[in-house]
Amino acid sequence: MKRILSLLLLACLVLGLLTGCQKTPDTPVVIQKDQEQMIHTAQHGRDNSALLAALEVPERFTGDWTGVNDFVHVTADAEIVLPNADKIPTGSIGRRDFTQEDADNLMRVLLKGNTLYEEQGMTKQQALERLEQLQAMQRGEIPVDLDGGYEALPGAIERCAEYARTAPDGDERVPAETSFVSRSENLEEIYGWSEVDGKTMHLFIQNCAGFLDHANVFVDGYGDLNSSSAIALSPIQDELPEPLSVDFPLEDAIRQGDALMEELGFERVICDNAYPVLFTRSSEADDAPSEEDWKSYILATGYELQYVRSMSSFPISWTPISGGAVAENESFSGAWYYEVIMLDITKDGLVYFEWLSPHTEPVLQVEDTQLMPFDQIADIFAKMIMVKNSDVQVANEQNGFITTRNFEITKVKLGLMRIRAKDSFNEGLLVPVWDFWGHSVWEWQGETSDFGEEILLTINAIDGSMIDRELGY
């Protein structure tokens, strides 16, 4: 798994949960859900006051299934992960932007209240050197290395010359604006750098209406405004010549993370996932490092912690699936990404903080949700994993060669998922779902493609209907 630790300057775009108790469909159609019906279904059903006994959940999920004319094969010997909670809630949640209070809080805690300075671009000397380089391209003395080619050179030369006239001579410190500055009708941001305990820290907070709001604070070298500095890489162990090791325990990182969440004022967040990572230059980390020189690429090792909001101690699970997709035959009208706070911690402490898509505090609607027995969920999985992959048969007929899809289920996790209301990107219902994680390997004509670990299927734990995490319903 890879995640670029950088600040992607997003181009800001202008911009009724599960039909309760429905029969599981024979085609993977994802439908809008009716919220009132879902609340009713959550309140009336089996008595599962004792969580494990009521759900009849085994210690492991096991099985072996073949379908779609033997083109799809699924195996499972997976752990079943349940939250540390006695009851399963259902609730509601909303979307919000970062507030000035949020920004002030991040600067107070992560920058320790130190002065925020404007990010500096090229110095005057660097700008003049670049100007000479562009002019040499125009004279034909060196190859043209510029987006747009030779035709783009006059404009680039003019802009570079203009910048050089006012560029700083060196290390000038200009205090930055610490309130949100509007960049366009739908975009406002705060950004700059500060010196904290002898380290340069960068801060970037952006509200982008109808798209993705995000806040990033990081130590210089572990992220970059131009998306070029460092990556946190959680590699497949088999791809490394030696097992990945971290020289301090995970428990220490979680203690640091919990303390930071408390200092930031997050009262109901949970560390829902944690794993070791190594940090390496992004330009050199497109693939796992080679055996010859992989160690020379490593900046540090540490852990990545994922914090999510919770309701009644039940986590609102985050996944790498962003939730910003558009249904087929629908035009883009907005996106609502799932919320997460990610911390990257090395032996030297926090090196990267990322907060995506802030949400409101969840509101409890049903304290003890009634769920479908797990054996029924397992039966639905066995059927729907084949339905979801039934397209392989048509593909094989059209392609003229055989492709097989092999799935290995590695984890089954119960958590809350935010399902947005019909035609709304601002309000959603929190419902319990079963996420089936696993590896998928496709094989054809002697070739293989491994898609790594991902969520293969999400099933509503109340009524057993299928949910598309990308669409958000």
For each predicted feature, which ranges?
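A short, surface-exposed beta-strand/turn
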Residues: 202-225, 317-357, 444-473
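Activation/maturation switch segments at domain boundaries
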Residues: 30-34, 416-473
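Helix N-cap and loop-to-helix transition residues
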Residues: 99, 249, 372-376, 460
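Segments that shape or occlude catalytic/ligand-binding pockets
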Residues: 253-444
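C-terminal motif of bacterial Sec signal peptides marking the signal peptidase cleavage site
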Residues: 16-20
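Positively charged n-region of N-terminal signal peptides that target proteins for export
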Residues: 1-11, 22
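Preferential activation on post-signal-peptide N-terminal prodomains/segments
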Residues: 21-332
